[in-house]
Amino acid sequence: MRLSALILAQALLGLLLAPGASYSQTITDGDTLKLNGVTYRLWGIDAPEAKQDCPDGWPAGHLAATHLQSLISGHPLICERKDTDRFGRTVAICRAGGEDLGALMVRDGYAWAFLRYSADYAGQEALAKREGLGVHRHGCQPAWEWRQRERAKYE
C-alpha cells in the first residue's frame, strides 16, 4: 500500500513540473515574481524598478519585467529558497527550464549583480558591461540608488 502511495505522489509531482503544466505565476518586476501564491525575490540581483527609466528615456523597469517574462514563458519554473527578506518575500534562485534566471537577467543587461549580498553574478555583469548591454548601454542608475533617490523626494 505504501509503495502505491509513493508511486502516485511521484506521478503527481511529475505532472506539476512537466513543461506546459498549469501553475499560477505573475511577474512583479525584473527581480520579483509570484508563483502559486508565494512571492519570490531573485537571489543576488537587483533589477530596475517597474517605473524606472534611464536618463536617455529607455524604460528599464518595464523592459526588465518583460524580459523576465520572456525567460519564463513556456518553461517549468522551480525556485530554491535561500533566505527571507525584510518584506517577507522568499529570496530564491529560480530556474526556468533549468536556466538560472538571475544569471540570465544580469548577463543580458536587465539587472545588476547585487554585490551587497552576493558575488554570484559578478562575472555575468562584467560581460554585460563589456558588451554594453541594457542598463549599461543606457547609463541607468543602479536600482538601489534610484530607490534611495525616490524615497528622498518624499522625506
Predicted feature descriptions by range:
Residues 2-7, 14-155:
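Small beta-barrel nucleic-acid-binding modules, primarily SNase/OB-fold domains
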